[in-house]
Design a protein with these regions (language model features):
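A conditional alpha-helix N-cap/helix-loop micro-motif detector
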Residues: 33, 101-105, 134
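Glycine-rich helix-loop-beta junction characteristic of Rossmann-like nucleotide cofactor-binding loops
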Residues: 40-44
Length: 365
C-alpha cells in the first residue's frame, strides 16, 4: 500500500490554512449572497470520492470548497492565470492545476494520488465555462473513478450566471448548491464498447446527473443551439469592393462571438486582442493584425487553446482563418485597401426565443 510520502500531494494538506479560509469564505458568502446548500449528507464520511459539478462562473469552486464536511482538493485551470486578486487567493489556498487542451498526465497522477489516499477530489467534467449547458463531458472523471474505484457525487449549481459580477455589485444573488446521490464507481464491463467509449458513456452519465440537479430556469439563459457565419470583402479607395473566400471564416465567427474565449486572452493572458471584440468601431489594420498575431502567439505556447474549447475541427479551422486573414491584412495594407468582415450569430433558446447578432469589422489600411 502507498504511504503519503509517495504522493506528490499529501492529503489532507494545508489543513489549518484551509479551515480558516473556509470559515472566512462561508461568512463572505452569507454576507454577499444568499447561499442555499442541500444534500451534503450524500457525501461519504470516509473513503475516496469525487465531487463533480457544473461550471458557469468563478464562484462554484468556492462553494464546493467551503461547504462539504471533508477537505476538498480541487482541480482547476492551469493553462490560464486567474484574474487579479483571485489568482493570489487561489494560489494561497492551493489546487491541482491542469493544462486543458493538452494531455496533462502529471495533473491526473496528482489527482489520482489524492483519491488513493482516501481523499475528496473536486472536478468539473465540462472542463470550462465558455459554453455552459452545451459542452461535452470530458472523460477524466471516468478515468479517475475507474482507477481509484471512487464513487462520484453529482452537484448542481444554480443561479451562478453573472454571479460574480452580482456579488461585486452587492446584489446578493441566490446561489444554490444541490448535492445528489452517489454514482457508483466506474467498472469496465465485458460489453461491446471500447474503453474510450465506455469512459465517455460514464462521463456523459455524470454530466446528465449533474444537469438534473440544476434549476431548469438556468438553461433558459444560454442558447440551446447557435450558428455563425462571416463574409469578407476587400474595398478599394474608389469604393468598389470584391468578395474574398478564405478557409475557416465560419469558425472564426464562432470564436469572435464567444466572449469567454476573448476575455481569457485579454484579461487572463493580458494579450492585446481588444480590436477583435465585436463592436461597430472602425479598426486600423496594424491594430487588428497585432491582435490576430497575439492569438497565434498563444497557440504557439498552448496549441490546444482553441481545439479544446471549440472542438478539434472547428479549432483548426479558426486557426487557419486567423493565419490567412493575417496574410490578407498585409496585402490590404500594401495596396491601400479596406477589409470588411460581416459576422453574424443566430441563437435559439429552449423557451422558443430567437436572437440574431450582426457585427461588422471595418479594418482600414
Amino acid at each position: 500500500m502507498n504511504t503519503s510520502n509517495q504522493f506528490e500531494i499529501s492529503y489532507p494538506r494545508l489543513t489549518f490554512r484551509r479551515k480558516i479560509l473556509n470559515l472566512v469564505g462561508r461568512a463572505l458568502l452569507r454576507l454577499l449572497a444568499r447561499p442555499q446548500v442541500s444534500g451534503l449528507e450524500h457525501i461519504p464520511a470516509e473513503g475516496p470520492v469525487i465531487l463533480a459539478g457544473n461550471h458557469v462562473s468563478t464562484l462554484e469552486p468556492l462553494l464546493m470548497a467551503v461547504y462539504p464536511h471533508r477537505q476538498v482538493e480541487l482541480i482547476g485551470a492551469g493553462d490560464l492565470p486567474f484574474e487579479g486578486f483571485i489568482d493570489r487567493l487561489v494560489a494561497f489556498y492551493g489546487f491541482i492545476p491542469v493544462n486543458r487542451g493538452n494531455l496533462d498526465r502529471k495533473a491526473m497522477v496528482k489527482a489520482l494520488g489524492v483519491l488513493e489516499q482516501a481523499g475528496v477530489l473536486g472536478i468539473y467534467p465540462e472542463g470550462g465555462t465558455w459554453n455552459p449547458g452545451r459542452m461535452k463531458a470530458q472523460v477524466g472523471v471516468a478515468w479517475l473513478s475507474h482507477k481509484a474505484q471512487a464513487p462520484v457525487i453529482p452537484i448542481g449549481f444554480s443561479g451562478f450566471h453573472n454571479g460574480f459580477s452580482k456579488v461585486l455589485k452587492f446584489e446578493r444573488p441566490t446561489l444554490k448548491m444541490s448535492v445528489g446521490e452517489p454514482i457508483p464507481a466506474f467498472r469496465l464491463d465485458n460489453d461491446s464498447l471500447t474503453v474510450k467509449d465506455a469512459y465517455q458513456k460514464y462521463a456523459d452519465l455524470v454530466l446528465e446527473r449533474i444537469n438534473s440537479l440544476v434549476d431548469p430556469a438556468d438553461f433558459l439563459l444560454v442558447p440551446q443551439k447557435s450558428d455563425h457565419a462571416m463574409r469578407l470583402r476587400l474595398e478599394s479607395e474608389g469604393g468598389s469592393s470584391e468578395m474574398v473566400e478564405i478557409v475557416g471564416l465560419q469558425a472564426l465567427a464562432e470564436f469572435l462571438f464567444t466572449p469567454v474565449m476573448l476575455n481569457s486572452l485579454a484579461n487572463n493572458l493580458k494579450k492585446p486582442v481588444r480590436p477583435l471584440y465585436p463592436t461597430q468601431q472602425t479598426r486600423q489594420n496594424k491594430q487588428f493584425s497585432e491582435a490576430l498575431q497575439a492569438v497565434l502567439d498563444v497557440l504557439d505556447e498552448n496549441p490546444g487553446f482553441l481545439t479544446y474549447r471549440m472542438g478539434v475541427e472547428q479549432g483548426h479551422l479558426a486557426e487557419s482563418a486567423v493565419r490567412l486573414l493575417l496574410q490578407l491584412l498585409d496585402t490590404a495594407h500594401n495596396t491601400h485597401k479596406t477589409i470588411i468582415l460581416d459576422a453574424t450569430m443566430h441563437a435559439w433558446y429552449r423557451d422558443g426565443r430567437f436572437e440574431a447578432k450582426i457585427h461588422q469589422y471595418r479594418i482600414t489600411p
